[in-house]
Swiss-Prot record:
Its EC number is 3.6.1.-. This is RNA pyrophosphohydrolase. Accelerates the degradation of transcripts by removing pyrophosphate from the 5'-end of triphosphorylated RNA, leading to a more labile monophosphorylated state that can stimulate subsequent ribonuclease cleavage. Belongs to the Nudix hydrolase family. RppH subfamily. Keywords: Hydrolase. NCBIfam families: PRK00714.1-3, PRK00714.1-4, PRK00714.1-5. A motif (Nudix box) lies at residues 44-65.
Length: 160
């Protein structure tokens, strides 16, 4: 695909979850499908007709095994935050239908224990997970998502 063709593609609607524990640390998972250190917060597509908040709670459950009853939604981003994939990834992901993702983010407070987290889900996304100080998030994320993570941190700053 040429850069011009990619620029004409839409963004995939997606939600992201910033899950914080009682110490103010943020859940990140190491992606299973990446050989390099590619940590990220839980995220995933919004199904047609699905409410974004419901999608965020579903994605949290699907990717971390966290029961939605243990996650309190504290805030959400006002806007949808887009990011573009690197050109070489566009044809490999989502059958080349999207240039990247447009994400609605939710800050959730985790009211469970570490033992309530189970990344060995039906369709595992992560090979390992950890709690990370919010200040260390951006440097641990793949470069093409860093601007979105900066915007998410800015949006939720009053709650961190």
């Amino acid at each position: 695909m040429t850069p011009e063709e990619i620029a004409r593609l839409p963004y995939r609607p997606c939600v992201g979850v910033m899950l914080m524990n009682g110490q103010g640390e943020v859940f990140v998972g190491q992606r299973r499908d990446n050989n390099v250190a590619a940590w990220q917060m839980p995220q995933g597509g919004v199904e047609k007709g699905e409410d974004p908040r419901a999608a965020a709670l579903r994605e949290l459950w699907e990717e971390t095994g966290v029961n939605p009853e243990l996650a309190e939604v504290v805030a959400e981003t006002e806007d949808w935050l887009p990011y573009d994939l690197p050109y070489d990834l566009v044809p490999k992901l989502w059958k080349g239908r999207y240039r990247g993702q447009e994400q609605k983010w939710f800050l959730m407070r985790f009211h469970g224990a570490d033992s309530d987290i189970n990344i060995a889900t039906e369709h595992p996304e992560f090979s390992q997970w950890r709690w990370l100080p919010a200040a260390d998030l951006v440097e641990n994320i793949v470069p093409f998502k860093r601007d979105v993570y900066v915007a998410v941190l800015d949006a939720f700053e009053a709650h961190l």
